[in-house]
Amino acid sequence: GLETALSWNVVNIELVGTRASPAVIITQREKAVVLFRGGSTTRRAVENQLEKRGVKTVELLVDLRMQPEEPCRIEAQKRINAAALAENTTRRASCGEVDLELFRTRQGCILRMRVGGQRFITLSGTVRPAKPIRAEWLLASMARPDNIQYTDCLTLSSKYRWMEEDAEPV
């Protein structure tokens, strides 16, 4: 019917796991892209959510952790590990509706992503871009969004330390 055709191309973007280090899951149909950070609690939350969404294939897993204690055990066709990238290098990838760019800094990384005409950004570690970066959506974490201009924020917490100070969305 018409209803299934309409929901067939829906892209879901969700934060799951712990408030301290949430993962981002982008699902469309039976495929997903996972932006991973955190430990075993977040990994289990990702696996549960992928199962709930009926995902059969993780096309890309981007591990945003700067100092992973253990490898991320989520199966994926393709992986990018931020910690393994050289400082000041960029990796780009595309999967279905998702175009992403991962920029590695000395102490962290910036992940910019375009999905369905909307720009998303998430940070890991300590990142201070020299010039402002604009996005419609900040996918929030504990990482302070210095010099990031965003309209809306997807977050698991309203109590990140950076929110209390001067973090008014633009």
What are these regions (language model features)?
Residues 1-170:
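Non-globular, low-confidence helical/coil segments that flank catalytic cores
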